[in-house]
Amino acid sequence: MQRSPLEKASVVSKLFFSWTRPILKKGYRQRLELSDIYHISSSDSADNLSEKLEREWDRELASKKNPKLINALRRCFFWRFMFYGIILYLGEVTKAVQPLLLGRIIASYDPDNKVERSIAIYLGIGLCLLFIVRTLLLHPAIFGLHHIGMQMRIAMFSLIYKKTLKLSSRVLDKISIGQLVSLLSNNLNKFDEGLALAHFVWIAPLQVTLLMGLLWDLLQAFTFCGLAFLVVLALLQAGLGKMMMKYRDQRAGKINERLVITSEMIENIQSVKAYCWEEAMEKIIENLRQTELKLTRKAAYVRYLNSSAFFFSGFFVVFLSVLPYALLKGIILRKIFTTISFCIVLRMAVTRQFPWAVQTWYDSLGAINKIQDFLQKQEYKTLEYNLTTTDVVMENVTAFWEEGFSKLFEKAKENNNNRKISNCDTSLFFSNLLLGTPVLKDISFKIERGQLLAVAGSTGAGKTSLLMMIMGELEPSEGKIKHSGRISFCSQYSWIMPGTIKDNIIFGVSYDEYRYRSVIKACQLEEDISKFSEKDNIVLGEGGITLSGGQRARISLARAVYKDADLYLLDSPFGYLDVLTEKEIFESCVCKLMANKTRILVTSKMEHLKKADKILILHEGSVYFYGTFSELQNQRPDFSSKLMGCDTFDQFTAERRNSIITETLRRFSLEGDTSVSWNETKKPSFKQTGEFGEKRKNSILNSINSIRKFSVVQKTSLQMNGIDGASDEPLERRLSLVPHSEPGEGILPRSNAVNSGPTFLGGRRQSVLNLMTCSSVNQGQSIHRKTATSTRKMSLAPQASLAEIDIYSRRLSQDTGLEISEEINEEDLRDCFFDDVENIPAVTTWNTYLRYITVHKSLMFVLIWCLVVFLVEVAASLVVLCLFPKILLQDKGNSTKNASNSYAVIITSTSSYYIFYIYVGVADTLLALGLFRGLPLVHTLITVSKTLHHKMLQSVLQAPMSTLNTLKTGGILNRFSKDIAVLDDLLPLTIFDFIQLLLIVIGAVVVVSVLQPYIFLATVPVIAAFILLRGYFLHTSQQLKQLESEGRSPIFTHLVTSLKGLWTLRAFGRQPYFETLFHKALNLHTANWFLYLSTLRWFQMRIEMIFVIFFIAVTFISILTTGEGEGRVGIILTLAMNIMGTLQWAVNSSIDVDSLMRSVSRVFKFIDMPTEDGKPNNSFRPSKDSQPSKVMIIENQHVKKDDIWPSGGQMTVKDLTAKYIDGGNAILENISFSISPGQRVGLLGRTGSGKSTLLLAFLRLLNTKGEIQIDGVSWDSITLQQWRKAFGVIPQKVFIFSGTFRKNLDPYEQWSDQEIWKVADEVGLRSVIEQFPGKLDFVLVDGGCVLSHGHKQLMCLARSVLSKAKILLLDEPSAHLDPITYQIIRRTLKQAFADCTVILSEHRIEAMLECQRFLVIEENKVRQYDSIQRMLSEKSLFRQAISPADRLKLLPHRNSSRQRSRANIAALKEETEEEVQETKL
């Protein structure tokens, strides 16, 4: 960034904004980069502004019982705000004085008024000077108010962020991300946009008073006729606005539904393609779009009428003011033209300025109150522990996440009992819900310095809550805690901050090279880092999305280990690691590197418990066991089945299996208002979430997608509740910290299962606390793997043993503190946060306009029709001009002596009738023609939007994954949300306004030129100057706007990133650093925004300066040209004076149109994406010579066996190479192997080795080379749809879209209910579905939030069974499954897919034991492909990964092979006898 010229600019340069010329010149000549932007002044920096407001707010808090944020803002900004308001008022006063001089100039043309004639030239000079003064006053005032609004926004942005970092976890559990984003975007943007209008709340009444006084002098009491009409018009516009909001509110729900489905489709586009659901998803979305567009059209028609009312009101204001006076008393022309000019100013004040000002104050005060409430919420308090460096002690500790919740629970229970609920097992409900129970009860333990405490337990037992209490995030209600204050923490779900790998590991602690390298080695990160071109200095953005889940987990662990602390809290740090890597890291890092440190490890692995010094097992918040491992074996032999739910599926009753559904549904009913009767609550509780969650329309932010979707929250018209709404819904709050996707999920659900869904979903919100505890398991599968897939290879060879040394003994002198860098490179910040720069020209090309016009054939005809109507209007005006002088001359000859003696031209009663008829006739004609012109235009433009959405949706669904992998999910969603909203809402009305204003200006110029041809000579250069100036400015402004838009994203990204890692931030004490980073992001945005405001004001001022020159020319041509009549001069000067505002408005509208057309350019860019196979709408039509001749896929019908393909499921893979993007590095190279029909093959490899990639390659979802044959049919001989239908898929990322059970299982409606129920029986889903009202017609929302992860996996399994596929692909199907669902899947695979080929990628050893062959992938290639017997007998990855106990389980498999002798079996048995108890909890 460069030094700003503003620092050394002179007063004149600042007044005329000339200091912006260098950036305007550079932007016109070349593309602007971030380095071209100017540094902001110190007065605009977030640090100074936040410190100033924070100081005043603290003063307000300290001095008053009811602190008001507006008082703090007043003390910071009031005097400057008032100063610019007074200047603005003086500029507006000049508009009221101008018509007075105009009237004097017109009066000077009266032959009897020679005195006035002599000073006409001076009157003209005075009129021109008024325009110059107005220009010099208004623009600095408007810019100053915009500047103050920007500063207020920055200060409050920072204040909200600082408060967010201080909020207690209890408060965070009650606030959704959508509410925070709403505070930072929808609310605070009002200050930027509206502060310039705020002063009109007092300026407009003063202006109206002054104008009414001047009009009284002209028309006396008849003045109030026009004012009354304007007041009625303002009320009418308010009514139209209310009607428009009604339609928009109705439409918002439809937009929600469409965006929900679209978001789910985009997030799961791989699954959509794998299931061949493209046509089904397109049909669902288009049906929703149709309903949405009906309401869009209604809202657009109302908006059009509202906008048109302003344009056409000018006729009637003058008509109602002048006509009564003229009929009774007669009127001179001077009064007519003066009245017209006064009425134009009056109309603007009454119908635009004052209503806008009132709305601005209403919105701003509402936003300030919301922020004020937020700033007074409870803060996180660091607990005062009894500090010690020798041990950690808990004595009889009990804790609640929600204080006072037991009373609320009992009240709800009593209310429900009083209602005598029928057909509901209330005892089961309340026994499972456990709302009023503490999360931890009577916890006591003690560990000495240097010991390892392993904490185990079932899902929701309170393991994470225990760590939170030690960290101070959860305040104990009873008991004592004693430990050292120096804590290091590793979260269960890895959190990566924007920055380099080194920054993430060091995390502000002083850099020690030896310690750093030791930690890198212990956490198995050496080889990963070596694969990156920039090594550990590679910048990671968006939560480390370029890394695999295992890499993120190891970086998070390395961060915790690097810090020198007294107590290390490790919350399930090995969740995403393969068995071998986990084993090595546990040994080298936890057991050796940290041997002298006190460690608390949350785990579910028996081998970890065996090596722990002490074991603490929790169950339902209580201590189930505390002691050593040997004591555990002796005292609690049943602990495995008790805690982990390992009983077999058949031993559970149907009631217990279905308890998760029963509890979830009834919890929804309980969450309603307790004052509502049960019947009123129950009925909506089973329909769409939005129906029973009217209070909870605020957004739900998915932990993965929230960062990418803020443009949706900011730009769409969706409604959000404020922060204050959260306090009204105590029953909605979550109690447990453990998300539903935790490995080893228990039988009974948590009462707060985390909902995942996009930003704009209605219904149950996800709190910030849920966001912090959400899994990011799918982040590594994002589209950004294109940049990291080649680096995710990991060595299969174990690392060398780490020397048993104490790396923490090498403490540097400054190591006790945190080293916080104040210097943050803006370029690095851009790498961390910014989206890819769009490859769109700075100015919309003519080709885009032409293509837009030709999208729908009717648009061209409508534009021609508009031109015809305009010509008719101009012709009508010229006819009036021709008739007008004749009427006046005729009347002049017939006038009485008294009349002729007073003024030369007087309109008598007779001529008034003629003028009345002409005036009203022209007004009616223009009004009718305007309606005929505008309504078809708006209607057609919405039709064009409909067509573009349809084409874009088709293009995305048909695009190859290699193209979609290069796009960010949020970017795709923005096209369907923000850009389509622009095409639907903003563009039609903006185009209408531009065309209307352009035609008004052209018509006025034509009339003036006809009346005085000399003026046409001045008009030509003025028009040329406008066109050149617009083109010059547009290049720079659009680039600055784009940079500003890109600069906004890091602010919200940083907010969510901070929230997701808030516990880590507090544990490491990194809040100051993150505040600094947030301020840097704010400053970066401010630099772009301030420069955009400055250049915009430069442009606006130049427009007015050109017009002032034009008006001076018109004025003096009219005055100096002899022979002009009074009426002609009046028309010329009135039109010329009032062209100014219209012309400026028209030029601004043209810039707005160009800016909005960038959305059209982006949509066209998506429409032009290539299609899969380069052929849109592929359909398979085999030629006569194609072989085999009877190739087909089973779809709806049962066919003869001779016609079925595939029939056996044999696969042959030859030289398969796969890439994620065109031109990218190969992820898999030269893969060749074959699979026999009905065989089960397991895929083995380290984390990130390419197992999931291989499954995607089978489905042709990647850029692939080579050949695969299924039962002799090559994938090149049939279409993609046919090829993919040969596979059944259970993806790692489960896809449940918003719709009924039936739609989710059978979106094409191919199967009967009997078939679906039969399959539901097979996979164990019948009892689940039957619990819901409507059964198969029950509508699932929020990604199936009422279903457990296991049930969602069963849904995928049911889809595969329905597809009758012969080849089944399973990608980590047991990840995050509870044992019950896992047993169901294993049973279904054995029964329903007994004769199918199964390819399985799995970390769970038990599942792999059922495979006949294994494919080992290492370094992008097949390293080994063999049977289970050979894999166990050789040194292989499989043998390293499998435990001796699991090898013992494989004895039956090996014994079945006749090639193995009993001696080998005996040797294996002897080898594993000692470790036979080593199993997974």
UniProtKB/Swiss-Prot annotation:
It is found in: Apical cell membrane; Early endosome membrane; Cell membrane; Recycling endosome membrane. Residues 421-645, 1211-1444 form the ABC transporter domain. The chain crosses the membrane at residues 78-98, 123-146, 196-216, 223-243, 299-319, 340-358, 859-879, 919-939, 991-1011, 1014-1034, 1096-1116, 1131-1151. Residues 1387-1481 are annotated as: Interaction with GORASP2. A lipid is attached at residues 523, 1396 (S-palmitoyl cysteine). N-glycosylated. A motif (PDZ-binding) lies at residues 1479-1481. ATP 1 binds at residues 401, 457-464, 492. Its EC number is 5.6.1.6. SMART domains: AAA. Keywords: ATP-binding, Cell membrane, Chloride, Chloride channel, Endoplasmic reticulum, Endosome, Glycoprotein, Ion channel, Ion transport, Isomerase, Isopeptide bond, Lipoprotein, Membrane, Nucleotide-binding, Nucleus, Palmitate, Phosphoprotein, Repeat, Transmembrane, Transmembrane helix, Transport, Ubl conjugation. Glycans are attached at residues 894, 898. One of its GO terms (biological process) is response to endoplasmic reticulum stress. One of its GO terms (cellular component) is endoplasmic reticulum membrane. SUPFAM superfamilies: ABC transporter transmembrane region (SSF90123), P-loop containing nucleoside triphosphate hydrolases (SSF52540). It catalyses: ATP + H2O + closed Cl(-) channel = ADP + phosphate + open Cl(-) channel; chloride(in) = chloride(out); hydrogencarbonate(in) = hydrogencarbonate(out); ATP + H2O = ADP + phosphate + H(+). The keyword Amino-acid biosynthesis does not apply. The modification Phosphoserine is found at residues 548, 659, 669, 685, 699, 711, 736, 767, 790, 795, 813, 1457. Monomer; does not require oligomerization for channel activity. May form oligomers in the membrane. Interacts with SLC26A3, SLC26A6 and NHERF1. Interacts with SHANK2. Interacts with MYO6. Interacts (via C-terminus) with GOPC (via PDZ domain); this promotes CFTR internalization and thereby decreases channel activity. Interacts with SLC4A7 through NHERF1. Found in a complex with MYO5B and RAB11A. Interacts with ANO1. Interacts with SLC26A8. Interacts with AHCYL1; the interaction increases CFTR activity. Interacts with CSE1L. Epithelial ion channel that plays an important role in the regulation of epithelial ion and water transport and fluid homeostasis. Mediates the transport of chloride ions across the cell membrane. Possesses an intrinsic ATPase activity and utilizes ATP to gate its channel; the passive flow of anions through the channel is gated by cycles of ATP binding and hydrolysis by the ATP-binding domains. The ion channel is also permeable to HCO(3)(-); selectivity depends on the extracellular chloride concentration. This is Cystic fibrosis transmembrane conductance regulator.
